[in-house]
Amino acid sequence: MEVRVEGQMVEGQAGDSVAAILQKALSGKKFKAVVAARALDSAEELLDLSSPVPAGCTGIEPVYADSPEGLQILRHSTAHVMAAAVKQLFPKTRVTIGPSIESGFYYDFDVEKPFSSEDFSAIEAEMQRIANAREPFTREVLSRAEAIERFKAMGEDYKVEIIEGIDADTVSVYTCSGFADLCRGPHVPHTGFAKASKLMSVAGAYWRGDEKNRMLSRIYGTAFADEKALAAYLKQMEEAKRRDHRKLGRELSLFTFKEDVAPGMVFWLPKGMLVRTILEDFWRKEHLKRGYDIVQGPQLLRVETWQKSGHYDHYRENMYFTQIEEDAYGVKPMNCISHMLIYGNELHSYRDLPQRYFELGVVHRHEKSGVLHGLLRVRQFTQDDAHIICAPEQLEGEILEVIHLIRDLMNLFGFEYKVAVSTRPESSIGTDEAWEMATSALVQAVEKAGLPYTINEGDGAFYGPKIDVRLLDCIGREWQCSTIQVDFTLPERFDLTYVGQDGERHRPVMVHRAIMGSLERFIGILVENFAGALPTWLAPEQARLLTVTEAGDEAVSSMLEEFKALGIRAQADTRNEKLGFKVREAQLAKVPYILVVGEKEVQAGGANVRLRNGDNLGLKSVAEIAALIRTDAEEPFKQGGMRYSFA
């Protein structure tokens, strides 16, 4: 048989392993970096290197350890190595599940005494011993009955429960270093690939995410293809700790959380609410400028409405429900239904299209307690949600305009970003023709915008394909942000129409889009990206006046009024404290302009200007200081099509 590998044809024999074929095509160095392979046939399945080449396979694509797919496999294998180490050290531990996740892996254990970070050194040492031994991952296929019998004999009740819930005649089991685990695979060839690993944290997690079940001990870890990549990641994580928005939000008095009262929901403090209000006001003005109408829908809609939309069938696990008198209601997890009902409130002509509805809408989505994370993962949040209802021939142009809005926002904050087009998932509604037309419109708009993009197969919404935009912050982390979704199905379900030039009724198409996504999440990202030192235009306090002695109180009071009249957010610190102490407090509060008023400054009618980074600009008049702050606040807006105005 002949098999194509990276552009060359390789001769092989029936029954040859994937490894045997790859060794003929790749150099020794390249082959050593391969963790698995993809069979390029109709199934395109991932294979272990020890697997035989499937019959009829025309090509094999090697999966390298440092590729996104390779890292996922490597991390999953390292989770097995960690579980093997834990079982060696703590034999009475029962194992549950251990998947790879975005930046690493975890494994949940049922253990008498929950693990702590103090256990890490022993577990990591055992993991390194296993890695150094380069023990193979071996795969065997068992009948369900055989697998149940084996795991029962091992005392692994959780694995038995999982197997009993699998609707298949056979299951696969992988073994490394004497540890057998139920797993689909594939896995790395041997444990030596798990050398560049690190345990990161511990947490509690309920079995199957159900609070009624037993609390398990979860160990998080990460792994990379080499020590250099691991070291770079650990350095990034140290910087991330310094920038953690939960820590900075507390230190800067922006927001707080009360987990005992409202888990997954934010309490905005005055300074944080000011930041949010500034951002919201700017964003509303920007949308009005771009032809959007601002609307608002109710928080509760009858359950029948969510059944009609399809959300009840496809999304109800993420929704909250309540009862009012005899009727069941769903708390809205998104705003699209209200916007369609607003559109349907009156008859529309083709001359009215496109209709662009914008809402800073509060939504609620049920997230499991284990995944809640400050502002970044909450249960109540505000979406900068818009729905564009247009004629099919207007679709591509409208998508392009949304892409331009995303680009302008990213440029405003200096973010680089990545674009992906997500296609039809397995669970979906709508016709094949509608999905193809919608996907084509998204791809063409992205290409017209000149943006590089990738395809995420099967990752679209249940009602339509989408564009996902992930921004990159200053330390290289990616964050899911903007989304554009095309929907032919919901306008059909809610019987949306417009009167065309021919006098007949026609069906419009709808674009769902959010640019910041969740305002809470976006503010959390901004706080971390700028390490709390928000851009001057967004800072809750743009300037702080500091007196040296009581003699400066009157002058500071007068300056404060002048700044406020000019729309500059300024405060005064006239406490009887040492100047150095007050300067340090202003710097810790990330105030952009620190204005010192002593005897000399009082006589000159100005202030000594210090920046939060420590630079000293010397004595300036109130007018000069106001001009500095204005210029600084307006600077980010010069690059794009957005505008900033002082209140």
Swiss-Prot record:
The keyword 4Fe-4S does not apply. Gene3D superfamilies: 3.30.54.20, Anticodon-binding domain, Bira Bifunctional Protein, Domain 2, Threonyl-trna Synthetase, Chain A, domain 2. One of its GO terms (biological process) is threonyl-tRNA aminoacylation. PROSITE patterns: AA_TRNA_LIGASE_II, TGS. The keyword Metal-binding applies. SUPFAM superfamilies: Class II aaRS ABD-related (SSF52954), Class II aaRS and biotin synthetases (SSF55681), ThrRS/AlaRS common domain (SSF55186). Signal peptide: none annotated. GO terms for cellular component: cytosol. Its main location: cytoplasm. It comes from the Bacteria. Residues 244-535 are annotated as: Catalytic. One of its GO terms (molecular function) is ATP binding. It is found in: Cytoplasm. Zn(2+) binds at residues 336, 387, 512. Its EC number is 6.1.1.3. Its cofactor is Zn(2+). InterPro entries: aa-tRNA-synt_IIb (IPR002314), aa-tRNA-synth_II (IPR006195), aa-tRNA-synth_II/BPL/LPL (IPR045864), Anticodon-bd (IPR004154), Anticodon-bd_dom_sf (IPR036621), TGS (IPR004095), Thr-tRNA-ligase_IIa (IPR002320), Thr/Ala-tRNA-synth_IIc_edit (IPR018163). SMART domains: tRNA_SAD. Belongs to the class-II aminoacyl-tRNA synthetase family. Catalyzes the attachment of threonine to tRNA(Thr) in a two-step reaction: L-threonine is first activated by ATP to form Thr-AMP and then transferred to the acceptor end of tRNA(Thr). Also edits incorrectly charged L-seryl-tRNA(Thr). Homodimer. This is Threonine--tRNA ligase. The gene is thrS.
